[in-house]
A protein has these predicted regions:
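Positively charged, solvent-exposed patches that mediate nucleic-acid binding
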Residues: 1-120
Length: 120
């Protein structure tokens, strides 16, 4: 079954109650300047949230980081074998400019590690 490489509303995690639950009960992992909180989901498919705090730079910088993260999620979400609620966030400004290759590689590595962890 081929999964469409889009980022529709169905895969977005946007209810504050659900996001709070992920932050309270989820597992934390650091991907360099990107933080991730995740937990197994009761939903059929994985859902994602992207958040960048104001401390992470100017509005254009924050928007670029969000755009890069959403694009990486869109391209790589088909790698996930199980349903998760995942929150990606950036709390502080990166020490170096993030490029699309770096973000894509980190998201791919995270999804592969998540699959290994859940299959054990």
């Amino acid at each position: 079954m081929s999964m469409r490489r889009t980022f529709p509303k169905a895969v977005r995690l946007h209810h504050s109650r659900t996001i709070r639950e992920v932050f309270e009960k989820g597992v934390y992992l650091s991907l360099g300047p990107i933080g991730v909180k995740y937990k197994m989901a009761e939903a059929e498919s994985s859902r994602f949230s992207v958040s960048v705090k104001k401390k992470a730079g100017s509005a254009t910088c924050r928007n670029r980081i969000k755009r890069l993260l959403r694009e990486a999620i869109r391209q790589e979400r088909s790698l996930l074998n199980y349903a998760y609620d995942i929150c990606f966030f950036v709390a502080s400004p990166p020490k170096y400019p993030l490029d699309s290759f770096y973000v894509l590689r980190q998201v791919r590595r995270f999804f592969n590690n998540l699959n290994k962890e859940s299959s054990e």
